[in-house]
């Protein structure tokens, strides 16, 4: 890991955010999924990164194995059901999301359409994993 990433992680830690570094999408997936405990209730906000890294796929596999329960706000075409799932996701044990940007000073930049990611980041879930 180069000095720039070490510095960013140090700045995240100063903000009470545990930072991790991964060289590959596979490493990022392994780190992220390791933060989920058996029996956890898991949800997420809209994030292409979760799909590109295979995190959501792995979480669905964990659910099929009976290890976790998922609240999927995007698993329905019904807008009312989707909104209800987003609200319920705020009470999850682990909430996955991605930020729009991360500054070198360890600041997360978030712009959100419905507000569920930003709401989850600031209040609600027991643990938030930003990928």
Residue ranges: model-predicted function:
Residues 1-131:
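The feature marks the mature, well-folded catalytic cores of soluble enzymes
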């Amino acid at each position: 890991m180069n000095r720039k990433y070490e510095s960013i992680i140090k700045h995240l830690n100063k903000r009470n955010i545990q930072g991790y570094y991964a060289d590959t999408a596979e490493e990022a997936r392994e780190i992220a999924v390791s933060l989920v405990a058996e029996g956890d209730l898991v949800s997420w906000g809209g994030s292409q990164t979760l799909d590109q890294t295979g995190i959501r796929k792995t979480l669905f596999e964990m659910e099929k194995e009976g290890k976790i329960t998922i609240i999927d706000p995007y698993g329905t075409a019904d807008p009312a059901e989707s909104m209800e799932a987003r609200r319920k996701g705020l009470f999850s044990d682990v909430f996955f999301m991605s930020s729009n940007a991360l500054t070198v000073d360890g600041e997360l930049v978030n712009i959100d359409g419905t507000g569920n990611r930003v709401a989850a980041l600031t209040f609600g879930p027991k643990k938030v994993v930003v990928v």
